């Protein structure tokens, strides 16, 4: 608990508790959105806004600029006038950890002025103690302007953030200077690109659309001296995704080496230049959707002609589902006849499991990982998936951090446990499908060998500002209608070569309906038995150990 944050909360409730549109804030001494939103509503009341909202939007901006066209100025020592706006500024400073040297007052003297100067220096913009609209918006936010090293912040990214604020804030506004690369900074980097392309601040939205793509410059060592700011931008992105290079406007040998490494790692054409493919992969998760791909995936049961057409189009490996339906009646499951079509066409397969997984509630069931692991293993064995193959389990939504920790990781933990048990006689491996953050977290926890990255969703918070996982095998980047007989929906996937897929299947006999029903009953018994063992072992704090050795029981 912070005493000054507590005083700020108490001051807000005392001053505005009886004002329409304010409500109250929690008085716990902890900075959070509840307190920040209270400060925003307080400012709106001071600006004469009756329909208050927990948002510093266009209306609040307009009213602030009308009242303070040149910003909120520090008072002279002889000026004894008072204002609650000064108190709001002080409270916001305390919430960000900046001392005004005094309690909450209604004056804006030297202590508050020095705190504003310190804040502006941390932002990278420097200057006097005037609180401009950009500074006010930053104050009334959860943005941080000191290095958050314990959360992974690094100095070079913070320096880049400060440079952005100092040089491009008319386009980007004030962005955090915490040393972390995330959604807000990724958007700012696209806005910088748009500024270099000649967009006005109002038109530089941070959305990488057709216009932004059409105005890209191809830059190489030969013409780099004419495009120094473009080189600086490319270096900034590379540094953000941990391709370390000296942050300046020069095309040096170190930058050339890191650029080539990036192109190789992302399986882009290695041009050694900042071309369309490279720019788009630097700044968006899906990159250039029109680039060629060696892998693909689909929910269509492929006939012989479709498989041949895929091969003729340059695809080498296709992702197919082990089970499930499109809608309520159209099967998307890989069949024995389809395997013949795929093999005859000269294609390989990588198997995907998804019978849900596109909404959070699916993962709330603590037994779901056990169920899915058992069903996937049985389905894979039935169609001849050979030993050691990787099966990709899907997380097909933009999970927040708390959902990742409370549902997604426990789900994959249960999958990993069953894959390490005697039930997995084929020694199948676990793969993960999802946004970059999910793939990275699940893999880092030791629950997945390879990642199948859902990079088409460029707006996912789990993709924005994150590098592609080191263990990526497939990178899904574009969906389109593939022309064949008949035409079908196809996803293009970049292919790293880590997972070779399946070219040779085990020989199996097609099951009758009765045999399938018996197999399903057996699966249900195995699921119940396995979950019973987990329920017994988990209270003994032994469950984590079971991921490192094979579990068997009778």
Q: What are these model-predicted stretches?
A:
Residues 399-423:
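Active-site cleft segment of glycoside hydrolase catalytic domains centered on the general acid/base Glu
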Residues 294-296, 422-441:
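Aromatic-lined carbohydrate-recognition surfaces of secreted/lumenal glycan-active proteins
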Residues 329-399:
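Substrate-binding cleft of extracellular glycoside hydrolase catalytic domains
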Residues 85, 92, 230, 237, ...:
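Structural recognition of the beta-strand scaffold that forms the well-ordered cores
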Residues 307, 339, 373-377, 409-416:
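Generic structural signal for well-ordered alpha-helices
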Residues 1-325, 554:
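Cell-envelope/ECM-targeting effectors and their regulatory/trafficking segments
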Residues 278-359, 450-457, 534, 538-554:
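N-terminal catalytic cores of peptidoglycan-degrading enzymes
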Residues 291-298, 439-553:
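Functionally critical loop-and-helix segments that line ligand-binding/catalytic clefts
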């Amino acid at each position: 608990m912070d005493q000054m944050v507590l005083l700020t909360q108490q001051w807000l409730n005392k001053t505005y508790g009886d004002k329409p549109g304010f409500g109250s804030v929690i008085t716990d001494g902890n900075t959070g959105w509840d307190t920040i939103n209270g400060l925003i509503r307080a400012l709106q009341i001071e600006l004469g806004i009756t329909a208050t909202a927990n948002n510093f939007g266009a209306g609040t901006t307009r009213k602030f600029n009308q009242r303070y066209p040149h910003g909120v100025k520090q008072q002279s020592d002889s000026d004894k006038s008072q204002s609650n706006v000064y108190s709001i500024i002080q409270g916001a400073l305390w919430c960000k950890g900046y001392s005004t040297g005094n309690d909450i007052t209604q004056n804006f003297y030297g202590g508050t002025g020095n705190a504003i100067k310190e804040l502006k220096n941390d932002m990278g913009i420097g200057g006097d103690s005037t609180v401009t609209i950009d500074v006010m918006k930053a104050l009334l936010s959860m943005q941080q302007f000191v290095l958050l090293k314990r959360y992974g912040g690094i100095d070079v990214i913070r320096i880049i953030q400060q440079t952005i604020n100092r040089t491009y804030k008319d386009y980007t506004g004030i962005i955090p200077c915490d040393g972390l690369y995330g959604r807000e900074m990724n958007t700012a980097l696209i806005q910088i690109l748009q500024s270099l392309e000649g967009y006005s601040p109002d038109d530089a939205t941070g959305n990488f659309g057709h216009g932004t793509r059409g105005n890209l410059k191809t830059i190489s060592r030969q013409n780099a001296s004419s495009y120094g700011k473009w080189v600086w931008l490319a270096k900034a992105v590379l540094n953000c995704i941990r391709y370390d290079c000296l942050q300046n406007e020069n095309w040096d040998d170190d930058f050339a080496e890191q650029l080539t490494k990036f192109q190789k790692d992302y399986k882009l054409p290695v041009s050694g230049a900042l071309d369309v493919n490279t720019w788009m992969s630097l700044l968006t998760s899906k990159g250039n959707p029109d680039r060629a791909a060696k892998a693909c995936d689909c929910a269509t049961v492929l006939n012989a002609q479709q498989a041949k057409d895929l091969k003729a189009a340059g695809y080498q490996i296709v992702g197919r589902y082990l089970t499930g339906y499109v809608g309520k009646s159209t099967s998307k499951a890989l069949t024995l006849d389809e395997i013949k079509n795929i093999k005859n066409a000269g294609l390989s397969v990588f198997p995907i499991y998804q019978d849900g997984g596109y909404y959070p509630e699916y993962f709330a069931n603590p037994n779901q990982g056990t169920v899915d692991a058992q069903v996937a293993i049985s389905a894979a064995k039935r169609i001849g998936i050979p030993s050691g193959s990787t099966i990709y389990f899907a997380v097909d939504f933009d999970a927040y951090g708390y959902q990742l920790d409370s549902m997604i990781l426990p789900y994959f933990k249960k999958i990993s446990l069953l894959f390490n048990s005697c039930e997995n006689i084929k020694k199948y491996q676990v793969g993960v499908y999802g946004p970059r953050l999910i793939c990275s977290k699940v893999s880092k926890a030791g629950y997945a060998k390879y990642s199948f990255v859902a990079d088409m969703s460029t707006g996912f918070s789990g993709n924005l500002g994150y590098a592609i996982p080191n263990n990526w095998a497939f990178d899904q980047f574009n969906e389109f209608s593939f022309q064949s007989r008949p035409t079908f929906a196809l996803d293009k996937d970049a292919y790293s070569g880590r997972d070779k897929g399946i070219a040779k299947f085990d020989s199996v006999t097609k099951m009758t309906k009765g045999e399938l029903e018996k197999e399903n009953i057996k699966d249900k018994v195995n699921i119940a038995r396995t979950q019973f063992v987990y329920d017994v072992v988990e209270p003994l704090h032994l469950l984590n150990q079971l991921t490192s050795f094979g579990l068997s029981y009778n």
